[in-house]
Amino acid sequence: MERAVQGGDAREQANSERWDGGCGGTITPFKLSDESPSLHEWRLHHSEEGEDQDHPLGFKESWSFGKVVFKRYLRYGGTETSLHRALGSWERNTVNNAASRFLGFGQIGCTYSIRFRGSCLTISGGSRTLQRLIEMAIRTKCTVLQLTPSEVEGNVSGGSPEGIEAFEKESE
């Protein structure tokens, strides 16, 4: 017989989910397992590349609902196949299912963050704006993964991406 995960048990399961890289569980928003490189693989990759060049093995992303954080490192090679796979690492329904375990009657903070090529972009809002946050996270992830290193530098110094100002006004 299946047992519903609630309260402290849900947080405990979410914390273990963050570290063991499991996927497809009852509460994780991610569909793919964590693919963090081993220390040996990381060193090998960076010793072959020039010090001033940025050729990441992948990217980090996270979803958080209140104090519960789900993190993943995913491999990304910059190809169309790799992009399609990376964009499918989570879907609207998996995020909604995970969030529903932590959302109660009160408003809590929800955040999506992606780190790629040394730049981190985070979008957040209250639980009442979760659907809009998911839409923005989809667009943000697609845009960030398709940028060249020089475009990333330009966007970092240019401020927030298009649409953030409107979202901040809506969520107030």
UniProtKB/Swiss-Prot annotation:
UniProt keyword annotations, A-Z: Host-virus interaction, Inhibition of host innate immune response by virus, RNA-binding, Suppressor of RNA silencing, Viral immunoevasion
Gene Ontology MF: a single term: RNA binding
A GO-annotated cellular component: virion component
GO term, biological process aspect, one: symbiont-mediated suppression of host innate immune response
Residue ranges of the region described as Disordered: 153-172
Disulfide bonds: none
Pfam family, one: Tombus_P19
Similarity comment text for this entry: Belongs to the tombusvirus protein p19 family.
Subunit structure: Homodimer.
Function: Viral suppressor of RNA silencing which binds specifically to silencing RNAs (siRNAs). Acts as a molecular caliper to specifically select siRNAs based on the length of the duplex region of the RNA.
Protein name in the entry: RNA silencing suppressor p19
Source organism (scientific name): Pelargonium necrotic spot virus
